Amino acid sequence: VRVAVAEGLPVYILDLNRPLLDKMVAAAHTLDPDALEKTKHAKNPNWKIVSGKEEIGAGENRMELYPLRGASTERQYMVYFPESHLLYASDTLALNGDGGLYDPELMHEVAQAVERAKIKVDTVFAMHQGPMPWSQVLALIEKSQRI
């Protein structure tokens, strides 16, 4: 984040995260100065605040950002690529060694956000999980609720 701010890039942040990120950007890095500490326009971030659906770009690579707003995912958002029905689910999807969900509640909250947004998802991926069919994830959520 500090590098992006130093370069003057727009940074899309969830509204709830702004106070934390403002402090992070304002923090001095004098012992080992980073790019933000060295730049002349430091501490002036180009925040793009996400508090609801936010569209970025156009055409087949257009993205839509949606806050998750769950009990465990309140500070995360998902990224949807409508042309390919592809969903990036942030840091919510990870499988155990047995193929089950590491934390079913996280994916349950993503499924709720997908329903609220009324989007059609075919494939989902996340920080710790490669692409997999959305139908498979829904089945894993359902299975975890029966246990």
Regions found by a protein language model. Name each.
Residues 5-7, 16-144:
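Metallo-beta-lactamase
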